Amino acid sequence: MREFRRVRRVRFAACALVAAATGITLAAGPASADIPIGQKMTGKMTYYTDKGYGACGTPIDASSQDLVAIPAAWWTTPNPNNDPLCRGVSVEVSYNGRTIRVPVRDKCPSCDRTHIDLSQAAFAKLAPLDRGVVNGITWKFVR
């Protein structure tokens, strides 16, 4: 009986430790309310041409569709399909007197917080493709 109680305590302690670690992990990311809707940011844009499924779990073709991949730092859930960014959030991007609005459909793991990766189609509406990287853009999250 005594051995059973010890095993039970060890199991309970292990479960409590896992629960605490999970709680800390989940609490570490910003909540959906922390998406700074409307707050202008200055940064850079690049483009990509991937085809398949984006981080939001929907089919994408970055060579022909208007969309944006957002830096990993803005994603708040372990499963990006469930992330608030995938629920009607777009990005308004301005450069050189032009502005476009593109839906968030993907994640950019190599982008810092102010670097966005536009689809080739969207990038071409703001700058020539041969630029590849454009600094000095402004962008913001919009609904």
Swiss-Prot record:
<protein>
    <recommendedName>
        <fullName>Papain inhibitor</fullName>
    </recommendedName>
</protein>
<keyword id="KW-0789">Thiol protease inhibitor</keyword>
<keyword id="KW-0964">Secreted</keyword>
<dbReference type="GO" id="GO:0005615">
    <property type="term" value="C:extracellular space"/>
</dbReference>
<dbReference type="InterPro" id="IPR009009">
    <property type="entry name" value="RlpA-like_DPBB"/>
</dbReference>
<dbReference type="Pfam" id="PF03330">
    <property type="entry name" value="DPBB_1"/>
</dbReference>
<dbReference type="InterPro" id="IPR051477">
    <property type="entry name" value="Expansin_CellWall"/>
</dbReference>
<dbReference type="GO" id="GO:0004867">
    <property type="term" value="F:serine-type endopeptidase inhibitor activity"/>
</dbReference>
<dbReference type="GO" id="GO:0004869">
    <property type="term" value="F:cysteine-type endopeptidase inhibitor activity"/>
</dbReference>
<comment type="function">
    <text>Stress protein produced under hyperthermal stress conditions. Serves as a glutamine and lysine donor substrate for transglutaminase. Inhibits the cysteine proteases papain and bromelain as well as the bovine serine protease trypsin. Has hardly any or no effect on subtilisin, bovine chymotrypsin, proteinase K from T.album, transglutaminase-activating metalloproteinase (TAMEP) from S.mobaraensis, dispase from B.polymyxa, thermolysin from B.thermoproteolyticus or collagenase from C.histolyticum.</text>
</comment>
<comment type="subunit">
    <text>Monomer.</text>
</comment>
<dbReference type="GO" id="GO:0010466">
    <property type="term" value="P:negative regulation of peptidase activity"/>
</dbReference>
<feature type="signal peptide">
    <location>
        <begin position="1"/>
        <end position="33"/>
    </location>
</feature>
<dbReference type="InterPro" id="IPR048197">
    <property type="entry name" value="Papain_inhib"/>
</dbReference>
<dbReference type="InterPro" id="IPR036908">
    <property type="entry name" value="RlpA-like_sf"/>
</dbReference>
<keyword id="KW-0646">Protease inhibitor</keyword>
<keyword id="KW-0732">Signal</keyword>
<keyword id="KW-0722">Serine protease inhibitor</keyword>
